[in-house]
Amino acid sequence: SDAFVVPGCTSLMVPGDTEGAGALIAQNYDLSSVYAAAAVVIKAENEDGPDAIFYTSAGMLGCAGLNDAGIGVVINNLVPSDSGPGVIYPFMVRGILASVRIGDAIDAVLAKPRASGMNYVLCDGNGEIYDLETSANDYEVTCPFEGPMAHSNHYLQDRLKPLERRHWPARGQSVLRWGRATRLLKSIAQPDSEALK
């Protein structure tokens, strides 16, 4: 539908069963076509930690990925009003993918001085999924989930909503993508990787 042809990204989270089997995270990048020629998948070999593969654009350090310790990350840009000096998200993603344990991956985001807001969706090989909504100076963590969940480019946590920039023209499109993804996820009895495509 033409209603969804606006740049942005949407993440999907599907919790697994009690053993963690079937847990999934996914993301689409509805970016301007100008980025298509710069899209790359990179394998990073690390002597001091896990190797990782990640999706990014040429010149960036990483936007989404998975390491060989089973830690995965996808992201959604958020637009808080408290941006300032701090660590930018590509370095956060690299810190997440350098982690061996999910708790360390969470700390790679929450224990650092952040430059701005981002939504980080983390998952490990045991099926643990954590959604980290952040601003430069605050955060909220969602886990466990009551079924599948979607996230786009606006804050979902009530406590963080006042931090969102007031004059942000793409908010409506973000709400639209989030609503559509949420409805589609709820319409599938047990979402799997094929259904998320």
Give the predicted meaning of each segment.
Residues 1, 16-24, 28-197:
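C-terminal, well-structured catalytic/ligand-binding subdomain of enzymes
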Residues 1, 5-10:
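Active-site pocket-lining segments that scaffold enzyme catalytic pockets across diverse folds
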